[in-house]
Curated annotation (Swiss-Prot):
Keyword Isomerase: no
Protein name (database record): Zinc finger CCCH domain-containing protein 33
Any one cellular-component term (Gene Ontology): nucleus
Zinc fingers classed as C3H1-type: ranges: 40-68, 85-113, 131-159, 274-302, 320-348
Lineage of origin: Eukaryota, Viridiplantae, Streptophyta, Embryophyta, Tracheophyta
Signal peptide segment: none
SMART domains: ZnF_C3H1
Main location: nucleus
Keywords, comma-separated and alphabetical: DNA-binding, Metal-binding, Nucleus, Repeat, Zinc, Zinc-finger
Stored Pfam families: zf-CCCH (PF00642)
Gene: ZFN1
Regions crossing the membrane: none
Location in the cell: Nucleus
Domain of life of the native organism: Eukaryota
Length: 397
């Protein structure tokens, strides 16, 4: 019995067409699997065939289809050869690095005379590329290294030295380092002035003034104090000159330091100069900038503070009678802002009553030797004595 009996041919025609198409696809797959692709030794390899093992053009493809595809890939990888496909766009990664992770399967053009030509740039001392026409690498400016290495497309300027040795007239050199003020050494000479704390990296040199700029005249009320200060400074200069005989023999943190002036060791300007941008106000005042090379403002090399709008004392600090006292100046006797400080720096903070007996500040130790009280001990003793006086007054009342 015929299974298709009674079934119209019009309903069977779509099914027959689908079967015919399925058989054609099977035959084409068998043809692709059998590897019946043309071998053209003089032509470039078919990139699609090398990558997938198939070719949709079949026997009409004009490229070469080698039988051992894996051998071709391994040989090209060992030789470092990359396909040259004239007419195709150039491989950007190949032009930058000279290599290509896709190898012979890459569909772009790899000209041999341009291998890594885009990556041939000069390197800085850390091995990162210098690209003057590109923007600075922000990550490199912050951390000092770059995870992209030689393939980074941004500029990596030469790093500035953080430490440098500055030779002095003696037998010793002192490394410069940026640090905050420390509590030693102190000025230990017995005089009518408070203790002076020298910052780290600062070497005393005779004849230098702590603050730059022209010194203005002082008020008549401070004439006597200034005269005492100058006499004391001259005496200390003579004493230190007789001991050192004009030579500087190394820096001892525990020894007494003359107040004839100090000179900060010079360093190279590591802050960016941006002529078209506003000036960094903090840098103009202090000569320092916490943002460093990433600061967006201008840092002129020849930094000149604006002329002060008030009178300056003999040590170059502003006298502003109506303003509050500079806390740092009253505590340490110096001011990092110099003539640009907006607070008052009177000379009277350095002096106290000269008629007071100095025996009150000298105590005897257990060994029988006398020693001088420090500033903190003197203040504590004064506080204790004032407390006792208050107690006695309350008892009498």
């Amino acid at each position: 019995m015929d299974f298709n009996a009674g079934v119209p041919m019009s309903s069977l025609s779509p099914l027959m067409n689908q079967d015919a198409m399925w058989q054609m696809n099977l035959s084409s797959d068998e043809t692709m699997e059998t590897g019946s692709y043309p071998e053209r030794p003089g032509e470039p390899d078919c990139s699609y065939y090398i990558r997938t093992g198939l070719c949709r053009f079949g026997s009409t493809c004009r490229f070469n289809h080698p039988r051992d595809r894996e051998l071709v890939i391994a040989t090209a990888r060992m030789r470092g050869e990359y396909p040259e496909r004239i007419g195709q766009p150039e491989c950007e990664y190949y032009l930058k690095t000279g290599t290509c992770k896709f190898g012979v399967t890459c569909k772009f053009h790899h000209p041999r005379n341009k291998a890594g030509i885009a990556g041939r740039v000069s390197l800085n001392m850390l091995g990162y590329p210098l690209r003057s026409n590109e923007v600075d690498c922000a990550y490199f400016l912050r951390t000092g290294h770059c995870k992209f290495g030689g393939t980074c497309k941004f500029n990596h300027p030469q790093p500035q030295p953080t430490n440098m040795m500055v030779p002095t007239s003696g037998q010793q050199s002192y490394p410069w380092s940026r640090a905050s003020f420390i509590a030693s050494p102190r000025w230990q000479d017995p005089s009518s002035y408070a203790s002076l704390i020298m910052p780290q990296g600062v070497v005393p040199v005779q004849g230098w003034n702590p603050y730059s700029g022209q010194l203005g005249s002082v008020s008549p009320s401070g004439t006597g104090n200034d005269q005492n200060y100058r006499n004391l400074q001259q005496n200390e200069t003579i004493e230190s000159g007789s001991q050192s005989q004009g030579s500087f023999s190394g820096y001892n943190p525990g020894s007494s330091v003359p107040l004839g002036g100090y000179y900060a060791l010079p360093r190279e300007n590591v802050f960016p100069e941006r002529p078209g941008q506003p000036e960094c106000q903090f840098y103009m005042k202090t000569g320092d900038c916490k943002f460093g090379t990433v600061c967006k403002f201008h840092h002129p090399r020849d930094r000149q503070a604006p002329p002060p709008d008030c009178l300056l004392s003999s040590i170059g600090l502003p006298l502003r009678p109506g303003e509050p006292l500079c806390v740092f100046y009253t505590r340490y006797g110096i001011c990092k802002f110099g003539p640009s400080c907006k607070f008052d720096h009177p000379m009277r903070v350095f002096t106290y009553d000269n008629t007071a007996s100095e025996t009150d500040e000298v105590v005897e130790t257990s060994t029988g030797k006398s020693r001088r009280l420090s500033v903190s001990e003197t203040r504590q003793a004064a506080t204790t004595s004032s407390g006792k006086d208050t107690t006695i007054d309350n008892t009498q009342q």
